[in-house]
């Protein structure tokens, strides 16, 4: 369809789009029809075992961003717009090269909470937008089911005699729900008498924070998924020895519940670019990257794979480099940092209500946030491309200043209007292709042999800018347990507010000299990392005062209303 800069809602643009049958999208991406399992006309799962090798080994472009603000940055929008622009450039070349997208699935909790949707925006969306944002192909339901089946099996084992000597006080594996529901953070189960189970304190996490989700996204195939599920530590016995899913003997049934969900989902952008949307861990409380299986499949079918990692480069991008890239051959060859004039001014102290007013002084103050993210990406041996997601309120003076600043830092920069013009990222695509052709020296931030405590301190000081890390007594006790159980060599997954480099969400810009507070650690032995909980970050979010859900509805014809 023809793009226009006329203001329209994301949902209206999506509903007016003319979609291609999913078989056509698959054919253009080199995915054979026999590998597809249709979910309607425009969605399909892909059986990767039936996709032949193409000889391609696509290079990965990782899209990340500055520290997020309520003003919005447009990372997913840029990811989609960049892939569309790359495909347009490849078509003009006539060389047969192609790009694909690998994205995370939206979580229903944030969709109904603050975000309202997570499929891009404007003329740079993945479609069908409303179906992807709601139940999609049921992957999160399957992950819910596997997670909660494990919880039920643990409690049943205790009730039926407790042969494993499970200590109910030391069960670390929680139930999950794909919803923001603060009332479920701490609960007591098993009440009502001796036939109702064994009473104990429990709690719920949001599904995207669960270890089942992490295992799902890091597994390389079905067998690896089963192996990782078996390695999950769900608690400890009365002798304080760790207990695993394999010890309980239920890794088989949990894998069975996930055998269809593990197949990547194929959809399309508004411009017809193939998109694999699969898995969805948060980057503030989990590792924040889509599934290894989807990214690896995209690399087999495309020359350039555009993917994203959640929130700012201090969270999702760091975890992509230090966690996901260790488990699979998906290391990025180029990195894009998405920024907006509005977000940088907010980091410079401008309230949201005044962001439309031109203010180069505030931009100068707030650019320190972008500067640190650039520096952080360079620590991994990669020179990032900065993409300015343009808004109509951006003044030419502000844009000129930011371009000049980036050039003074030796940073490639492109101004993109992918929201209003779909593939309006031609300059960004050219800069990214140049970055892919430039020499790079990808490296991890730390060696796995370092003790967990030192890894946390290194991330806090080198990436966040902290002066030191303060560990609670509980955290120190957990570190000793981790070392005693031989888990010291696992990478670290920091759980931290997304809004600041610190653990205080109100400290915007690029704070330094602060103390990072680690209150606890959770070994995720199936996923293969240690979660370090900092500050007041929650693994079960709550809804805001005015949830996005209040604007959502369905009309008499069954069309979605209010998604964005």
Swiss-Prot record:
Known EC number: 6.3.4.3
The entry's keywords: ATP-binding, Ligase, Nucleotide-binding, One-carbon metabolism
Biological or metabolic pathway of the protein: One-carbon metabolism; tetrahydrofolate interconversion
Keyword S-adenosyl-L-methionine assigned: no
InterPro entries in UniProt: Formate_THF_ligase, Formate_THF_ligase_CS, P-loop_NTPase
Pfam name, any one: FTHFS
EC main group: ligase
Catalytic activity as recorded in UniProt: (6S)-5,6,7,8-tetrahydrofolate + formate + ATP = (6R)-10-formyltetrahydrofolate + ADP + phosphate
Coiled coil region boundaries: none
Residues the entry annotates as binding ATP: 69-76
Name of the molecule in the record: Formate--tetrahydrofolate ligase
Cytoplasm found in the keyword field: no
GO terms of molecular function: ATP binding; formate-tetrahydrofolate ligase activity
Disulfide bonds: none
GO biological process: tetrahydrofolate interconversion
Family of this protein: Belongs to the formate--tetrahydrofolate ligase family.
